[in-house]
Amino acid sequence: MRQTFFLPSHVEGCCAALRRAGYAAYPVGGGVRDLLLGRAPQDWDVTTSARPEEILALFPGSVLTGGVHGTVTVPTPGGPVEVTPFRAEGGYSDGRHPDAVSFGVSLEEDLARRDFTVNALALAPNGTVIDPFGGLADLDAGVLRCVGNPARRFGEDRLRMFRALRLAAQLGFALYPTVEAALADAPSPANLAVERVGAEVDKALLSPRPGWVGEMLRYRLLVPWLGSTQADTTPLAALPARPLERWAGLAGLLDDGELPEKLR
């Protein structure tokens, strides 16, 4: 794991502007995780003590894109940065979205609502990694572990079950035993939008380990759309990592020519 961290200038600039205005600001989430793994982050998120209206006032041209979550997309020369206030969430009656969101909480409270320990990491201004839930050790061990109780986390947002398997495919990580147990007793994901499910399947299919899509079948996560189909998906790794080939390969293994349409 890398020990020296160089933030892209547009991310550092976004954080610096928030700090000059008197707010705390930390790069957080998947961008930090990928930076620590030596991977090129695809997206950057910043969490801050500023509220949505304060973020919008500070960055001309920024747009509120996260609705009740308060996420503001800040355009920069290096690409957009998603800036979100520290927040806590409560109640998930639909198994996907929080019933209530509150701002003005601490950084640790914000990190505590996140899905996996490796995504609950933040970078302090001096480059120190803020890691209240053991995410660094899990990165070193190559395991995906939930923040808190995995059954509760999956019950809050059932798309997290798909994210667990997709991240395992992308990162080459193993699932922590408690995560495996929660998946084996998972709630039905039938309430999820098929487009969101299909996007997670697509990312797993195009990863270096597309056979993990078979785990989605084994854990019966795709039953609402595909029924109880099972298949050995290891041959997918031999196909070029292009959407047409991988989707066609999966459709062939499942003997379902309509598969792509069912998950889009």
Where on the chain are the PLM-derived regions?
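Catalytic cores of the polymerase beta-like nucleotidyltransferase superfamily
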Residues: 1-264
